[in-house]
Amino acid sequence: MSQRVYIFDTTLRDGEQSPGVSLNVGEKVQIARQLAKLGVDIIEAGFPITSPGDFKAVSEIARQVKGVTVAALARANFQDIDRAWEAVRHAEQPRIHTFIATSDIHLKYKLRMSREEVLDAAVAAVKRARAYTGDVEFSAEDASRSDLDFLCRVLAAAIEAGATVINIPDTVGYAVPEEWGKFINTIYHKVPGIEKVIVSVHCHNDLGMAVANSLAAVMNGARQVEGAINGIGERAGNAAIEEMVMALYTRKDQYNLYTNIKTEEIYRTSKLVSALTGMKVQPNKAVVGKNAFAHEAGIHQDGVLKERTTYEIMNPAMVGISKSNLVLGKHSGRHAFRHRLEEMGYNLSDEELNSAFERFKKLADKKMEITDEDLEAIIEEEMRLVPHTYTLEYLHISSGTTVVPTATVGLKRDGQLMEEAACGNGPVDAICKAIDKITGLNCTMTSWGINAVTAGKDALGDVSLKVTADGEKVYVGRGISTDVLEASAKAYVNAVNKLIWDSQK
């Protein structure tokens, strides 16, 4: 049996099903490119039948992202499968991922099908997909709650029909590691032909055991694990890819397995996904959380200073957390700026570099020292792939304990300056109302949050907010500035630009 574990990333499909997450096509392509750079083996780009937007995202990723298998999801029916192939056909390595539920509860209440009907549908779906491509993955939805004998019949039939990957999902996060490992082991011994295919698992985190269950499956023969960056996904999320990868890497003595992941890209990938989805990473999150390599207790600090391995089982550099001593400031030139960005893994076009350098110089006038975190924030803001319908020109605020908060905002559109003023329940509310007056939109802000990019009085504030115009589709906006209110205005304009761009497509 191969010692390689394939990494199947579903950030753009299952991950995007997280409540409040809505990515546009450009953002999905940007994440897909970074996933390819990270070294994932398969990117599940979306579910093409569900919407024109999903179809376009899968199609664009298939055309633009190279060196990786691109998968499209489809239910076990011909219409879904045909649509999936139409979207993914231009990929260098296309895969159709088709699924049907096998648990009695799903058969009775969702599908309203008999076991034999499900078996026939699975076989027909795999054959249809194989007519298009030699790479077909079959998933038995809710496998962990399925009758084992029936599940094995379906898996055997799917293999005989031509499936090359057999995925066994713990769809509702019901399994526990010891049980799940035995479950996978039993399937290996009961399903004819299973040695000819790659066995995969897709574990959810409802009981907090998605990563543990995935690793238990690997110990029992699974050679593909499915998950999402930062563990995002429906309900409590998916298995976190960064945690599975670093567990396999750090505990080679236990697993004796490897992946093709470039671990130094993990942190940058995590930050990109967090920035574009608006889902913040909890500070104590394993591997990529803000506190993952922080030591506050005096004994721990003393130990780490004397010898890092006393309290750190991973080197921060392994996952791409930089400890560079190079500090940039207002006297730093374009060459030093470009050099540092290249060291950090960013390769910008001349146009992007010029724009980013202008932002850097403006920030350097306000901050004495520019850190890597500041640079990352600048680049993330620069690389947002939405046309700037409106740009913030200026902002004046009047606020206080005895004054009604008032904001005067100036925006530019097509070179024309537009100004409006508004009062609000607070300065941020006043800013948003003034912007709505200019744009003619009536948006509702559903969340607002700020992170300090670095420490100190002159720290950059990174504001992330979510807005909706119809109560359904949510748009994430981000803005950075040393001024919290300016960052809020930038974030709101960013969200509004996304909304306008989406409505014009």
From Swiss-Prot:
Enzyme class at the top of the EC tree: transferase
GO process annotations (BP): L-leucine biosynthetic process
CC cofactor: Mn(2+)
Keyword Transferase: yes
InterPro entries: 2-IPM_HCS-like (IPR050073), 2-isopropylmalate_synth_dimer (IPR013709), AIPM/Hcit_synth_CS (IPR002034), Aldolase_TIM (IPR013785), LeuA/HCS_post-cat (IPR054691), LeuA_allosteric_dom_sf (IPR036230), LeuA_bact_synth (IPR005671), PYR_CT (IPR000891)
Chain residue ranges for the region called Regulatory domain: 391-505
Protein name as annotated: 2-isopropylmalate synthase
Species this protein is from: Pelotomaculum thermopropionicum (strain DSM 13744 / JCM 10971 / SI)
Lineage: Bacteria, Bacillati, Bacillota, Clostridia, Eubacteriales
Gene symbol of the encoding locus: leuA
